[in-house]
């Protein structure tokens, strides 16, 4: 299968891309930087095709995903500086990336009938439950701005 992986400059995207390639899949990575800026560890992700993409730019998302023609998208890109996301001057940017960017990717995947996997976070729950969360649990209680915007991303998918 051919995968398009967002956020390969971060830990999650880096590891997802390496695992896909290790399993014999074709992978195209992306992140906001002009060139790959993740860990230069010589692993497969550092040698794989890479495209710069600002996921908050709806037209760019459409153009890039249409050009890659993936069988599936694994969306790992996110604003992950949890504490900094609480700063009043950062909230709009965090929401634009985690919710709006995810919406942009989901819209294109739907239009192209392309599978999409979205990686969220446990911060969409408050951690106060007394029993394990069930897969279809809707008892959301985001802990902070990061959790709220990742939940908005979940709902976009």
Sequence positions of predicted segments:
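N-terminal Rossmann NAD(P)H-binding glycine-rich loop of SDR-like oxidoreductase domains
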Residues: 1-23
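SDR active-site strand-loop-helix element
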Residues: 6, 30, 73-77, 116-121
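Rossmann-fold NAD(P)-dependent oxidoreductase module
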Residues: 15, 19, 108, 156
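Conserved glycine-rich Rossmann-like NAD(P)H-binding loop of the short-chain dehydrogenase/reductase
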Residues: 22-38
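Rossmann-fold cofactor-recognition segment
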Residues: 43-58
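NAD(P)H-binding glycine-rich loop region in Rossmannoid oxidoreductase-like domains
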Residues: 55-97
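Catalytic helix-loop patch of NAD(P)-dependent Rossmann-fold dehydrogenases
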Residues: 92-104, 124-157
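A short helix->loop->beta-strand "cap" motif at the edges of active sites that frequently abuts
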Residues: 111-114
């Amino acid at each position: 299968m051919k995968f398009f992986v967002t956020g390969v400059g971060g830990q999650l995207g880096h590891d997802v891309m390496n695992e896909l390639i290790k399993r014999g899949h074709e992978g195209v990575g992306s992140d906001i930087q002009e060139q790959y800026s993740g860990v230069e560890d010589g692993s497969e992700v550092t040698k794989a095709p890479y495209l710069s993409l600002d996921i908050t730019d709806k037209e760019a998302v459409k153009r890039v995903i249409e050009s890659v023609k993936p069988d599936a998208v694994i969306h790992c890109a996110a604003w992950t500086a949890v504490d900094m996301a609480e700063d009043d001057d950062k909230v709009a940017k965090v929401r634009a990336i985690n919710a709006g960017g995810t919406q942009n990717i989901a819209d294109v995947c739907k239009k192209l009938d392309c599978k999409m996997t979205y990686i969220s976070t446990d911060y969409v729950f408050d951690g106060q439950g007394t029993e394990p969360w069930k897969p279809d649990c809707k008892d959301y209680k985001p802990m902070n701005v990061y959790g709220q915007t990742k939940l908005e991303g979940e709902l976009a998918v």
